[in-house]
């Protein structure tokens, strides 16, 4: 196969799926993202004291991580420390 044929074949197989019809609204996109996230994650809701939350936000911004990543890390670290998670 020549390079030209190879390029055409690879570009055809890598085409993006184009959604036909009316574009999704921002809220529909958000709902779809949450639905995908729920397939692999569970939601937790907690109330923490304001100073702790403020410190967490500062730390996350400084480290370039999300608050969810921070919470997952401290839960994982504590479960490993307790020998619950290996």
From Swiss-Prot:
Polar residues bias (residue ranges): 1-14
Region annotated Disordered, chain positions: 1-31
Pfam families: RepB-RCR_reg
Record has Repressor as a keyword: yes
S-S pairs: none
Single GO biological process annotation from the record: plasmid maintenance
Matching InterPro entries: RepA2
Protein name: Replication regulatory protein repA2
Keyword Hydrolase carried by entry: no
Gene Ontology MF terms: DNA binding
Biological role stated in the UniProt entry: This protein is involved in the determination of copy number in gene replication. It binds to the repA promoter thus inhibiting the synthesis of the mRNA for the initiator protein repA.
Keywords for the protein's UniProt record, in alphabetical order: DNA-binding, Plasmid, Plasmid copy control, Repressor, Transcription, Transcription regulation
The species this protein was found in: Shigella flexneri
